[in-house]
């Protein structure tokens, strides 16, 4: 594996262990050229997914992009980082097992929202505000009121 610090291709694995409930392998690596240490994760990839945007544009699925958007929604929430990793792995496995390699971005967004709703409602609302492109406070108000249908509006 290429060293991210100096580009040397001869790095050494110093430690390997299971991660994310045994669906990934965490490897600590060392670069003898520059002394750099870094961590890599190895995961099973069932198939190469392609995201189909609403504009029709297609791009390769990027787990890092999915992870970034979920971590932004989960920022400063009392959720363990391992739980977030498990959630992301679960979403990716679900996408890979759908049977088609072309996945509409809308489907990905809905799966993420469905998953977040079960884990943390604040993160769910945060993600939804970006995904559904909220423009005003009324958009938040309407969305949150739909979360609590039993409440009577004043």
UniProtKB/Swiss-Prot annotation:
GO biological process, one term: negative regulation of DNA-templated transcription
Keyword field: ATP-binding, DNA-binding, Metal-binding, Nucleotide-binding, Repressor, Transcription, Transcription regulation, Zinc, Zinc-finger
Cofactor note: Binds 1 zinc ion.
Cystine pairings recorded for this chain: none
Listed InterPro entries: ATP-cone_dom, NrdR-like_N, RNR_NrdR-like
Zinc finger map (unnamed): 3-34
GO molecular function terms attached to this record: ATP binding; DNA binding; zinc ion binding
Pfam families linked: ATP-cone, Zn_ribbon_NrdR
Cofactor field: Zn(2+)
Domain ATP-cone stretches: 49-139
Family, per entry: Belongs to the NrdR family.
PANTHER family: TRANSCRIPTIONAL REPRESSOR NRDR (PTHR30455:SF2)
Function, as annotated: Negatively regulates transcription of bacterial ribonucleotide reductase nrd genes and operons by binding to NrdR-boxes.
Protein's name according to its UniProt entry: Transcriptional repressor NrdR
């Amino acid at each position: 594996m290429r060293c991210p610090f100096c580009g040397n291709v001869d790095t050494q694995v110093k430690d390997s262990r299971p991660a994310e409930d045994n669906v990934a392998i965490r490897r600590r690596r060392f670069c003898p050229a520059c002394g750099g240490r870094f961590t890599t994760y190895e995961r099973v990839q069932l198939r190469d997914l392609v995201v189909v945007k609403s504009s029709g544009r297609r791009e390769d699925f990027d787990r890092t992009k999915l992870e970034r958007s979920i971590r932004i929604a989960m920022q400063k929430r009392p959720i363990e980082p391992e739980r977030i990793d498990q959630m992301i792995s679960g979403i990716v496995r679900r996408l890979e097992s759908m049977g088609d390699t072309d996945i509409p971005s809308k489907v990905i967004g809905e799966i993420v929202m469905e998953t977040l709703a079960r884990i943390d409602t604040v993160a769910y609302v945060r993600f939804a505000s970006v995904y559904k492109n909220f423009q005003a406070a009324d958009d938040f108000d309407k969305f949150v009121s739909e979360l609590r249908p039993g409440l009577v509006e004043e």
